[in-house]
Amino acid sequence: FRYRQSVDKKEINEALQKIDSYLGQTLFVENASIKPDGGLIEVQDDNAKWRIVLVSEAKHQGKDIENIEKGVLVGTKKDQDLMAAGNAIERSHKNISEIANLMLAESYFPYVLFLEGSNFLTETIQVKRPDGRIVTLEYNSGMLNRLDRLTAANYGMPINTNLCKNRFIKHEDKTIMLQAASIYTQGNGRSWESKKMFNIMFEVAETSLQMLGRDLWNQINRK
């Protein structure tokens, strides 16, 4: 196994070129790269080729819970309980797309995205201010929730689900391969426990190794 923090765009283009010479032609910045927060874990297969088994990122967006608990008001006039959600999380789409390009020849996609913060609620919560006032955060508020901006990365499939195995969809005379990120959110906006994150990442990495089974056969059966 090996761990890497980043992947060069040049390597991604080379992987695309191996599939079809028309792909991976464009590169303007020679040293361009991507750097997912959690990096990449790879295994060397029986043919000495490095194969990705896990890519992970953790993103926090929305500090409304923390601000309310501290009694901090927000907004230009400092008179609001809630701050309108931003778009910073959408940067994750770039890394997901690039790893999908790198793994286009594979039949699995072990990209895990962990989300926390008030912009990723899946349930309505109530938070108490220091003065005792209760503030309600609605999970389906267009002002707060940004989950719908990320589910494009998993084709609107379920969140909090291991989607590592690619889905092959038949439509009319075509078969379409879907590479979907596995998106996990706490739901209540709170921070992730490291053990829960580890268990999820372990499950996804295990799925990757299962998908690579025939290419790891000699190592698995080595006495």
Spans of features found by a protein language model:
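Basic, amphipathic N-terminal segments that precede the first structured/catalytic domain
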Residues: 1-49, 195, 199-202, 206-223
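Short, conserved acidic/polar surface loops in the N-terminal third of protein domains
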Residues: 49-52, 65-69
